[in-house]
């Protein structure tokens, strides 16, 4: 009975982030694209400013990287979120599964692991699909700074 109960419980509810396989870890990403928006840092204060400017490799419509497996070849500054460096990324959105699980919180009901698709996430406007602009179309990056979210203060 206990084995059946364990298998019915989703992996993210029965494993810590450290216990997850690489495939499970990767599947936590909801594909919102928020990590793929450029951030600007104030040289004097190290304060991070969020923009709506998408990385060149982000397909804005699908919110997927065009070259995910080889992304560092195309974008050397692309982040690689790992179990070890997760605490360094304080700017991750409140909706990020990695952040939520690290804080002991549940996945949101719209998360693709809960629903089986990204439709609910896009419907909730969690993804950057509705706000992102192509890097090639930006003249002055400062014009694209978003209001800093309250959680990042």
Swiss-Prot record:
Task: List the InterPro entries hit by this protein, alphabetically.
Answer: Puta_zinc/iron-chelating_dom, UCP006173
The UniProt entry, under Pfam families, shows: CxxCxxCC
Q: Which family does it belong to?
A: Belongs to the UPF0260 family.
Origin species, per record, is Salmonella typhi
- Note the SS bond partners: none
Query: Could you name the domain of life of the organism this protein comes from?
Result: Bacteria
**Name of the featured protein:** UPF0260 protein YcgN
């Amino acid at each position: 009975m206990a084995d059946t109960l364990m298998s019915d419980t989703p992996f993210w509810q029965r494993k810590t982030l450290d216990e997850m396989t690489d495939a499970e870890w990767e599947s936590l990403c909801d594909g919102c694209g928020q990590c793929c928006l450029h951030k600007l840092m104030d040289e004097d204060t190290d304060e991070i400013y969020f923009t709506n400017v998408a990385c060149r490799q982000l397909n804005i419509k699908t919110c997927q990287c065009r070259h995910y497996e080889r992304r560092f070849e195309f974008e050397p500054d692309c982040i690689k979120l790992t179990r070890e460096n997760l605490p360094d990324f304080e700017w991750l959105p409140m909706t990020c599964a990695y952040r939520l699980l690290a804080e002991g919180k549940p996945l949101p009901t719209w998360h693709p692991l809960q629903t089986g698709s990204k439709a609910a996430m896009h419907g909730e406007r969690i993804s950057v699909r509705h706000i992102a602009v192509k890097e090639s179309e930006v003249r002055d990056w400062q014009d694209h700074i978003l209001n800093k979210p309250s959680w990042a203060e």
